[in-house]
């Protein structure tokens, strides 16, 4: 049996894919706030913010601790702001086949999609749906409006 996770608002939820946002600056906190503004409070969802003067080993330990805190046995998805950046590289160091995945280039549509599928989807399906949603909503307004 998997643990029941507290949501932070007195509601308990069953096993789900955990989410950890790892970004430059406070972006992770803001993405979490924006996600919860749209879809409501999220259980098993943590942030790790990387500052320019931070001790990177300490931040890596924070990532590992965040992973442990959101892992209910269904897997954990780490989302980072930019592939090749320090947050992404630290997240990739925790990659574990079938258990921990990293998606770089996080955006709000991706997070909203993950929020809607992570309690029922398998890991790979959730990763694929998040990536698809992230790509789908990148649009150039003038091209959309003129059909060009």
Short names for language-model regions:
Residues 2-148:
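N-terminal loops that bind phosphate or other acidic moieties
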